[in-house]
Amino acid sequence: MPRKAREYPEEGEFVVATVKRIHNYGAFLELDEYPGKEAFMHISEVASTWVRNIRDYLKEGQKVVAKVIRVDPRKGHIDLSLRRVTQQQRKAKLQEFKRAQKAENLLRLAAEKLGKDFEAAWREVWVPLEEEWGEVYAAFEDAAKDGIEVLKGHVPDEWLPVLKEIVENYVEVPTVTIDAEFEITVPKPNGVEIIKEALIRARDRANKEKDIEVKFTYQGAPRYRIDITAPDYYKAEEVLEDIAEEILRVIKQAGGEATLLRKEKRIRKVKKRKK
C-alpha cells in the first residue's frame, strides 16, 4: 500500500480511507496512505442531505475518498468529510492513488534487483522523489521521457542503473493529441503540388522536435486535417500555431488562401510507450 512521506495529511488534502468502525454519530476511518493514522468523520459530513441512518452511506471495510477538514498533530486528531468531495475530485484522487500503487510496485522491483528491502527503498528513493515531484510516478515519467539523469542528485547513484532499466521497460510517457483542419486553395495549374509541398515542409519541420508527431490527412478538397501528438496540451497548441503560420505564409506567397478551422478544441489523451 503506497504511503506518503509526511506523517500527517494537510487540511484540504484528499485521502483514500477505509471505514473501520461505524457509530450513530459518525465513523472512524483508517488512512490508507498514512499507516497507523485514524480519522473521524461526523455524521454531518457524510452527505449533503440529512442522514437518517449512517449505514445507508458507509459500510465497514469500504474504501472512500474523503477531504481532510481538520488536523491536530499534537492531539493526533484528523477530521474527514465525504460530502465535500465532488465526483471529479474523487476520480482524480483515485487516479493519483493508482499511480502511487504503480510507483510502489516498480520501486519494489528495483529494490529486489538491487538486493535492498523496501524500507531502504522508501527512505532513499520514495521520500526524496515525492518531496521534489509531488508524486513518485511523475518522477518516473520524467525519467522515461528525459533520461534517468533527471533523478541524479535526488537519489543515491547506486539506484540509477536499475531505475533506468525499470522506467524504460515499464513506464509509459503520457501524451496528448489535438486535431484541426486547414482549408487551402491555390488557383494555379500546379496548385495541388504547392499545397502538398507546404504541408510536407511544415510536417517535417515540426517532427524534428523531440516527442512531437504531426500527421496530415486529406479530407477532400479544399480541406486537410492535422493531428498533433505532443507531451502536453500547451506544447501541442504551440506546434499547431507555428505550423499554421508557416502554411499561411507559404500559401499566401503562392497566391492562394489558407484558413485554420477549429470548431472546438478537441483533445485526445493517449499514452505512448517510450521506445
From Swiss-Prot:
Entry-linked SMART domains = S1
Instruction: Identify the residues that the record assigns to the S1 motif domain, covering every copy.
Output: 12-83
Q: Which SUPFAM superfamilies match?
A: eIF-2-alpha, C-terminal domain, eIF2alpha middle domain-like, Nucleic acid-binding proteins
Going by the UniProt record, its keywords in alphabetical order are: Initiation factor, Protein biosynthesis, RNA-binding
GO terms of molecular function: ribosome binding; RNA binding; translation initiation factor activity
InterPro entries xrefs: NA-bd_OB-fold, S1_domain, S1_IF2_alpha, TIF2_asu_arc, TIF2_asu_C, TIF2_asu_middle_sf, TIF_2_asu
Name a Pfam family for this protein. Answer: EIF_2_alpha
Its subunit composition reads: Heterotrimer composed of an alpha, a beta and a gamma chain.
**What is stated as this protein's family in its record?**
Belongs to the eIF-2-alpha family.
Query: What is the annotated role of this protein in its UniProt record?
Result: eIF-2 functions in the early steps of protein synthesis by forming a ternary complex with GTP and initiator tRNA.
Q: What is this protein called?
A: Translation initiation factor 2 subunit alpha
Gene encoding this chain?
Answer: eif2a
